[in-house]
Amino acid sequence: MRQDQRAYNEIRPIKITRNFIKYAEGSCLIEMGNTKVIVTATIDDKVPPFKKGSGEGWITAEYSMLPRATQQRNVRDINKLRLSGRSHEIQRLIGRALRAGINFKALGERVIIIDCDVIQADGGTRTASITGGFIAMFDACKKLYDEKIIENFPVTDFVAAVSVGICDGVEMLDLCFEEDSKAAVDMNLVMNDKGEFIEIQGTAEGAPFSWEQFQKLLELGKQGIQKIIEVQKEVLGQDCELVGSVPKDEKTSRCDQE
């Protein structure tokens, strides 16, 4: 039993509040245990240079953390006059993950900007940002679709993420901060609702891990993501039937120009 009384294969309580921000085209507050992230989606007609004239859209992301989202105050990136390496890595991950669930031709020549602002951090902020980012992206696309700006709904797959790791020799799902800080192995998994992997980030922080342990972590993560996607579907209700109405364009989904 873990410090918060969860089983090793149990995700933290998850709550997603849809349309959390009044002005954004899509938004949500996602809570995974004590981790809380506000995510917004903004539609912009100015696509990156490599997409101009292509008729295709793009998804990009930004990630930041409030100074007191953590136990000790962190300096804002803007006050350091540069984006921290951690924030840069995370926002690239979020963008890549969400692009795997969109058809850029159906989106049209526009960009959706996903802003992830962590207001309270207790581990798993990047995975929560991806899971919440999908909801915000979905609602931004729905606005375009409902207003008949686009003909086809461009979201092709559900996308969600979770962390897994090895603590005290035990494979665990959805690590909180204390578990993450002492984990011998730390891994982040991103998958879609077809059971396909989008990204695997894994590091032996304290000790190497075996192939058998790796397989156990993948299976734990797969089970966790399936449960998280079930929550996403509950939040979207009947709207989730729109997902997958157009197929994925594999050629454009694999671009990583950022």
Swiss-Prot record:
The keyword Thylakoid does not apply. Pfam families: RNase_PH, RNase_PH_C. Keywords: Nucleotidyltransferase, RNA-binding, rRNA processing, Transferase, tRNA processing, tRNA-binding. InterPro entries: ExoRNase_PH_dom1, ExoRNase_PH_dom2, ExoRNase_PH_dom2_sf, PNPase/RNase_PH_dom_sf, Ribosomal_Su5_D2-typ_SF, RNase_PH, RNase_PH_bac-type, RNase_PH_CS. One of its GO terms (biological process) is rRNA processing. Coiled coil: none annotated. GO terms for molecular function: 3'-5'-RNA exonuclease activity; tRNA binding; tRNA nucleotidyltransferase activity. Phosphate binds at R86, G124, T125, R126. Homohexameric ring arranged as a trimer of dimers. Belongs to the RNase PH family. HAMAP family: RNase_PH. This is Ribonuclease PH. It comes from Caldicellulosiruptor bescii (strain ATCC BAA-1888 / DSM 6725 / KCTC 15123 / Z-1320).
